[in-house]
Design a protein with these regions (language model features):
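Small-residue-rich helix-loop
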Residues: 309-310
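Structured, contiguous alpha/beta core segments that scaffold functional sites
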Residues: 2-276, 280-289, 293-296, 300, ...
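Short acidic alpha-helical/loop segments enriched in Asp/Glu that coordinate divalent cations
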Residues: 295-305, 330-343
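Generic long, charged, amphipathic alpha-helical segments
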Residues: 335-357
């Protein structure tokens, strides 16, 4: 069947390219009720509505968001240029000052990146407006609230960004003027909120915390009660007196004293208390699992030891922080550089400080590098934030252990030694 016959056959039978439907299915980014899966919205299984605002009030969520966002914000971020001599800092590039020091007139680089990560962790997406000069040079970056942004596609399939300001006005921003960093998502365009995806786990944490608060504020259990042998004449008076005397955490464990022949009955439920505490402990680990944060970084030292905390921290840097850094770097490289600059300039975080081990391990590593000739004294001093040694004093010299030689040189040396030994023996015989 020829190409024309094939086309005629498709038109007659109504067949279409099977991939067309796939592309149409992802035309609208999945950030709205009509496009997002049903599990994305609604209350949690514990009956609690989970939003970014309610979730951040849970101490474990706040601690996880804070430790990730502050760690990323504290890492040095710079612009580099790939040259024939290697990769060098491009401190003269306009983006260097924006990313390293001050992205706009209202905030520092630390605050900007901290906000950016908080948006990613709570909403699944980070948006920043790119301000350019008349020469198309980036002169400012301003973070935008993710829950005020609507992302869609126009009739031509191009992405559109519509932002709703605090006074209710809508502003359409061109895609080239938006630094959009998506988190984990299903369509490659929009990220999903970890809070919404894991609403059941977080909702259970909110419910258990609310239960504990209400228990101690309104229903603190006394150590015992007295029962009346007959019908109580004025239940309301007894109830009001009870709440006044034994309600609230300050009155917990007091013995209830009533009159008219009442008998004392101890009241205790240690099993329920233990289960409640276990539930709260489990939810701490569960929420840490969502954000991939070691529990000891949020104050849970139950399973931490002096020998494993360092390795857990390095694991946090490798498996939690680094993926976020790569996601941010690639999004910035795509959105902030011109087509002529891409491939030559790039954005990169410096993770050296985060990956540093204890002092003894660092010194042993430096010694190996120094003795094997692939680090100079100044290379080591730079990593330890110390001033360099002048080059004339050997600060940039590369040294190797004098006992280490090439295998071929060793074989040649042995052959020469054997020759000299034979010559000496012959001379003695001849003498």
């Amino acid at each position: 069947m020829t190409g024309k016959q094939d086309q005629d056959y498709k038109e007659e039978t109504g067949m279409k390219n099977p991939f067309t439907a796939l592309f149409r299915a992802r035309d609208k980014p999945q950030d709205s009720v009509s496009a997002a899966p049903l599990f994305y919205f609604g209350t949690s299984g514990a009956g609690k509505s989970v939003t970014a605002q309610t979730a951040i009030q849970l101490s474990t969520v706040y601690a996880c968001v804070r430790v990730i966002s502050e760690t990323v914000a504290s890492l040095p971020l710079g612009v580099y240029e790939a040259t024939d001599q290697g990769n060098e800092k491009a401190q003269d590039h306009p983006l260097y000052r924006l990313l390293h020091d001050e992205p706009n007139a209202e905030m520092t680089s630390f605050v900007f990146r901290e906000v950016m990560l908080a948006h990613l962790l709570l909403y699944g997406n980070s948006y920043s407006q790119i301000i350019r000069s008349g020469k198309n040079t980036v002169v400012g970056l301003y973070p935008l609230l993710p829950d005020h942004m609507d992302v869609d596609r126009d009739s031509k399939g191009n992405l559109t960004y519509t932002y709703t300001t605090s006074d209710g006005k809508t502003v359409v921003i061109k895609p080239q003027d938006i630094l959009h960093i998506p988190g984990l998502g299903f369509d490659g365009v929009m990220g999903y909120s970890p809070i919404a995806l894991e609403k059941n786990a977080i909702g259970l944490g909110i419910a258990s915390e609310e239960y504990g608060s209400k228990f101690f504020s309104n229903g603190a259990r006394p150590s015992g009660i007295l029962t009346h042998p007959n019908t109580v004449k004025n239940p309301k008076a007894v109830r009001d007196s009870w709440n006044s005397a034994y309600g609230g955490s300050s009155n917990s464990n007091r013995v209830a004293i009533l009159e008219e022949g009442m008998t004392f009955t101890p009241l205790s439920s240690p099993n329920n208390e233990a289960q409640f505490l276990e539930t709260r402990k489990f939810q701490v680990d569960e929420i840490c699992r969502i954000f991939r944060v070691p529990p000891h970084l949020v104050g849970n030292l139950e399973h931490a030891t002096f020998s494993n905390i360092e390795h857990q921290s390095i694991d946090f840097a490798v498996h939690t922080i680094r993926p976020w850094l790569v996601r941010i770097e690639q999004s910035m490289n795509r959105a902030l550089f011109t087509e002529q600059e891409k491939g030559r300039f790039y954005v990169q975080f410096n993770m050296d400080g985060l990956m540093r081990g204890d002092y003894k391990s660092r010194m042993e590593g430096y010694a190996i590098a120094r003795q094997n000739g692939w680090m100079s004294a100044n290379d080591i001093r730079a990593l330890e934030n110390q001033n360099p040694i002048p080059a004339e004093d050997g600060g940039d010299a590369l040294l190797v252990n004098g006992n280490m030689i090439l295998v071929t040189s060793a074989m040649q040396s042995r052959a020469e030694d054997a020759t000299r030994s034979t010559t000496k023996t012959d001379n003695r015989k001849g003498g």
